[in-house]
């Protein structure tokens, strides 16, 4: 992940699917990635990071990484996030991820998609992602979100979005998508 965020595409992947049983460490791994990306070069001195960097063949963790986190057990599409705090109301995973990645500028690209609950596709997702810095998207407990909204037909929209997001991220040299689902 750190190699890809650093812009290296050889022997790297842009998309990771972590699948283990409950209690298998998925959320802990996502938390590690979050702190590495959020703290950039400050994380170089954290215990164990030197080994990660050595194995990756890197001098340090890249700085200025845009990070977004979607947790399916926490996000509620009926109430959404924002709206009462001076930020736009966000009722979809793509609206929330866009907001976290680039604030109003990124959200503007998917605002209509969010309002109409229509998943964005490649060109729109590409505009939503920051172009000038590394980008890490973490998605945890996705199946919980899917099962909650299955009766509304929203689960297919999330699957379609994740597929389009995966393809868009693969086309970037410094973007990574990491998702977790229980085995």
Task: Please name every model-derived segment.
Residues 62-67, 133-134, 172-175:
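Short glycine-/polar-rich loops that comprise or flank the Walker A/P-loop
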Residues 41-53, 156, 172-174, 179-183:
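Phosphate-handling catalytic cores of nucleic-acid transaction enzymes
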Residues 33-34, 71-73, 140-141, 172-175, ...:
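A short beta-strand-to-loop transition that corresponds to the Sensor-1 phosphate-sensing loop
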Residues 97-100, 124-131, 156-177:
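Substrate-engagement module of ASCE P-loop NTPases
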Residues 4-15, 21:
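Phosphate-binding P-loop
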Residues 107-139, 149, 168, 172:
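Mid-core helix/loop region of P-loop NTP-binding domains shared across ATPases and GTPases
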Residues 145-158:
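Conserved ATPase-coupling elements of RecA-like P-loop NTPase cores
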């Amino acid at each position: 992940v750190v190699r890809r965020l650093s812009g290296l595409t050889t022997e790297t992947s842009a998309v990771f699917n972590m699948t283990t049983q409950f209690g298998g460490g998925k959320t802990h791994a996502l938390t590690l990635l979050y702190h590495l990306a959020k703290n950039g070069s400050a994380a170089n001195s954290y215990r164990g990071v030197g080994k990660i960097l050595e194995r990756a063949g890197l001098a340090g963790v890249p700085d200025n990484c845009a990070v977004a986190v979607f947790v399916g057990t926490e996000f509620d599409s009926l109430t959404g996030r924002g709206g009462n705090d001076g930020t736009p109301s966000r009722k979809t995973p793509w609206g929330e991820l866009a907001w976290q990645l680039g604030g109003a500028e990124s959200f503007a690209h998917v605002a209509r998609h969010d309002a109409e609950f229509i998943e964005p596709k490649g060109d729109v997702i590409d505009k939503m992602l920051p172009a000038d810095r590394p980008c890490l998207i973490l998605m945890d407990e996705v199946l919980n979100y899917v099962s909650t909204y299955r009766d509304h037909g929203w689960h297919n929209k999330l699957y379609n979005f994740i597929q389009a997001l995966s393809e868009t991220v693969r086309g970037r040299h410094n973007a990574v998508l990491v998702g977790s689902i229980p085995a």
